[in-house]
Amino acid sequence: RRGIDAAQGDYLVFLDSDDAWMPDCLQTLQTVIHNNAPDMVLYAGRVIREGSGGAQMIGHVFESEQWLTVSLMKEMLISGDELNSLWLKAFRRELFFGDDTDYSSLAGVHCGEDKVQLFYPLTQAANILYIPNCLYSYYYRADSTVHSFDVRDISRKLSQEMFSVLSLYMERWGMNDRRHQQLLALYQLRMYLSVYFGVRKSCATARERQILRKYPWGGIEKQWRPYYREIRCRLSVCERIKLLAAALRL
């Protein structure tokens, strides 16, 4: 937040300290902004893994340049993680003016805190331009705080602070109806499965497996269970099997 407050330019872009922009990143964005004057620009990046010769694309959601509606972007944030990152977006700086979001619950949080920063500027945006250009290099480290799983970090990985702020913004956006609650429930269910099986895979001892099973998963399940009959059809066969295994704490 201090960086945003100190910024002087017309547009803001973000860079994690251990990542890199592609050589043509800023020039490409300057040209796109000059030609289109968008409130936000979304672009793609590549994920570089240690010991791997290839690179996986991230943020590549469409094949061609196109304008997105703000409502579509909001629905994509309610539905999953695909567009979470600040660092695959450029923002008109004015979008951050007057941000009244309470970020106090996110102090020291390293899961979901990036996504929360998107909600206020998106509320202020009138238009969004997507370009398929790969402009960012994200260096994936399996032992990083974000990607590693540990039985002592279950609560952190479930991103409950992020979901709480997202729920407040859904109400603010007028997206608190049952259809949008179903999208959120499906997102929460998939987060639950990801964390449960990610942590289970990391358990090396009987004691760790016991901690996993004793965790109060029931409170997490209550978030999506009221919508399960409606969202069940959107789950893959694999997800349904995993859900049964998690429910039995296997």
Regions found by a protein language model. Give the residues of each.
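Short aromatic/hydrophobic "clamp" motif used to bind/position activated sugar donors
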Residues: L12
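Amphipathic alpha-helical repeat scaffolds of TPR domains
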Residues: A185-S194
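Short, charged, amphipathic alpha-helical segments
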Residues: R179-L186, R209, R213
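Membrane-interface aromatic/basic loop that binds lipid-linked glycans or pyrophosphate carriers
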Residues: F197-L250
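Donor-binding/catalytic cores of nucleotide-activated saccharide
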Residues: A20-L129, Y136-D153
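Glycine-rich, basic loop-to-helix element that forms the pyrophosphate-binding segment
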Residues: R1-A7
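Catalytic metal- and UDP-sugar-binding loop of GT-A-like glycosyltransferases, i.e.
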Residues: L15-S17
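C-terminal, non-catalytic tails of nucleotide-sugar-dependent glycosyltransferases
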Residues: S159-L183
